[in-house]
Amino acid sequence: MKRDWVKWLLAVAALALAGPVLAQTRLKWAHVYETGEAYHKWALWAADEIKKRTAGRYELQVFPASSLGKETDINQGLTLGTVDIIYTGQAFAARTYPPLAIGGAPFMFRDFGHWKKYSESAVLAELMEGYYKKGGNKPVAVTYYGVRHTTANKAINKPEDMVGLKLRVPDAPLYIMYPKTVGANATPIAFAEVYLALQNKTVDAQENPLPTIEAKKFHEVQSHINLTGHISEMLITIVSGQTWNKLSDADKQSFEAVLKEAAAKATDDIVASETKLVDEFSTKYKKTVVRSDRAAFAAVFQKAHLGPDATWDKALYDRVQAIK
């Protein structure tokens, strides 16, 4: 009897010790991109890597293609506690901290090199910290989303070619700057609804990076790929403040390291894909690829950068432009 009692006590003690090790927290990572895109591929990698580095204590479930809501919804979900991690564009994050929108303004960057240095700069780090202090959610990494181009059923060589065009834009204020400045009619439509809107001719055109145009199959319902190159875009990986604050310091380091590595890997994939797709839209998909007059477009936006729609001041603008 005594021996049985000792065995029981040992079993209870073993379970008590095993409890914390076996405890697992499931986290939701939401985004609006397709499963075939680099962002999703490396989010899945990050989920596996975080599970390994935390000895299975955290399991990330990745929800792609707007399955947990539109981009506006998942941004709100960070604060509501319905999602734990998201990818989002600067314009959406700027609803919380407006100066952050500067990196998503049309023709803000001279080229990819300028964007890359900005993405690694103290300027962006300060803006991310401002976002964190304002809303409590933690930006931990940035991924190159690509250069946004304009698809339509006609050639767009110069800004005047866009006058009166019904252009779908994401539902965030900054994206209105592009159509407004060139005389197009901005039509905000949720990402998941864009293909149908183009097919039904609810809108005439849309704008996105080449990898996204391919992944979302927008080329199926548009004849021209116009290389306007108007926005060099990034996605921000943001962890909900509620989730971030529960992590130990060691786990915070693990999460941040993995998410930054995933962002770097996705960036490499997007850069390679952009280069390849310029030719493939013509040769593989038989689309008309138009090399728009980017200099003419950029000239139109000089005043807009410090106009009434800018959510940043001249001092910040000058710092961004001074990055070499």
Report each predicted region and the residues it spans.
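N-terminal secretory/targeting leader peptides
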Residues: 24-114, 123, 130-324
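Bacterial N-terminal signal peptides that target proteins for export
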Residues: 1-10
